[in-house]
Amino acid sequence: AVPPSYADLGKSARDIFNKGYGFGLVKLDVKTKSATGVEFTTSGTSNTDSGKVNGSLETKYKWGEYGLTFTEKWNTDNTLGTEIAIEDQIAKGLKLTFDTTFSPNTGKKSGKVKAAYKQEYVNLGCDVDFDFAGPAIHGSAVVGYEGWLAGYQMTFDSAKSKLTKNNFAVGYKTGDFQLHTNVNDGSEFAGSIYQKVSDKMETAVNLAWTSGNNSTRFGIAAKYQLDSHAAISAKVNNSSLVGVGYTQTLRPGVKLTLSALVDGKNINAGGHKLGLGLELEA
């Protein structure tokens, strides 16, 4: 089997902790597709604490015959982005991406060239991030064999001529169980466990520890599928923050998400957060 990219190691556990929640936000996502195959994604978010509203628009066109994908992005910070990707054309398993952003307000520009190559037992990635000070090179590699996974990730800053990121990861993955551990820059240690208990129930545990301050972070989360249209999620961490979420598919293409974050140490003090999300797809 093809192993996941380094960024996707431990993703199943992270999804149980992150998906189905949107504390302190009112969010609307709309996805549509034109007759010519152009995909439009519009997103709007309002922060209930600050009152700040953010919006974004993305258009994507896939030219399947040539393995090309064109993406245009815009957000309310007035940042424009263009991405061109070509996959499985030069070589099978190879994806090349050219990504640029431009902010007319500040005149700031950025550019990235990304290369990803995946085959049986191996997943490689190399990104070059162009900056005025000098390019930064991000590299990653994951190898997998019979469920075992090992990965390495680095960033080399050419302006400083040194490694600014140096991460290792080891994991084990089966159909319904995943174990993942990683060490970041030799100082941050983390681990996660994901288990699909049944067709309806998924659980996850994560643990993180940073050397030097002896602070250990711990969390446990679960997701239960009530039926084909509804699911509930819950999570708690060692800071006594309790999160609950409810996701309901009202009808095909319409999904509602309700979530709440409760501070277990200060239940009567207020400061709890609510979230509302609506996804429309046509």
Curated annotation (Swiss-Prot):
Expressed in skeletal muscle and oocytes. Pfam families: Porin_3 (PF01459). The lineage of its organism: Eukaryota, Metazoa, Chordata, Craniata, Vertebrata. GO terms for cellular component: mitochondrial outer membrane; pore complex. GO terms for molecular function: nucleotide binding; porin activity; voltage-gated monoatomic anion channel activity; voltage-gated monoatomic ion channel activity. GO terms for biological process: monoatomic anion transport. Consists mainly of a membrane-spanning beta-barrel formed by 19 beta-strands. This is Non-selective voltage-gated ion channel VDAC2. It comes from Xenopus laevis (African clawed frog). The keyword Acetylation applies. The chain crosses the membrane at residues 25-34, 38-46, 53-63, 68-75, 79-88, 94-103, 110-119, 122-129, 136-144, 149-157, 162-174, 177-184, 188-197, 201-210, 217-226, 230-237, 241-250, 253-262, 272-281. The record marks 72 as: Involved in hexokinase binding. Monomer, homodimer and higher order oligomers; formation of higher order structures is necessary for scramblase activity. It catalyses: chloride(in) = chloride(out); K(+)(in) = K(+)(out); a 1,2-diacyl-sn-glycero-3-phospho-L-serine(in) = a 1,2-diacyl-sn-glycero-3-phospho-L-serine(out); a 1,2-diacyl-sn-glycero-3-phosphocholine(in) = a 1,2-diacyl-sn-glycero-3-phosphocholine(out). It is found in: Mitochondrion outer membrane; Membrane. The gene is vdac2. Keywords: Acetylation, Ion transport, Membrane, Mitochondrion, Mitochondrion outer membrane, NAD, Nucleotide-binding, Porin, Transmembrane, Transmembrane beta strand, Transport. NAD(+) binds at residues 241-243, 259-263. Non-selective voltage-gated ion channel that mediates the transport of anions and cations through the mitochondrion outer membrane and plasma membrane. The channel adopts an open conformation at zero mV and a closed conformation at both positive and negative potentials. There are two populations of channels; the main that functions in a lower open-state conductance with lower ion selectivity, that switch, in a voltage-dependent manner, from the open to a low-conducting 'closed' state and the other that has a normal ion selectivity in the typical high conductance, 'open' state. It comes from the Eukaryota. InterPro entries: Porin_dom_sf (IPR023614), Porin_Euk (IPR001925), Porin_Euk/Tom40 (IPR027246). The modification N-acetylalanine is found at residue 1. Belongs to the eukaryotic mitochondrial porin family.
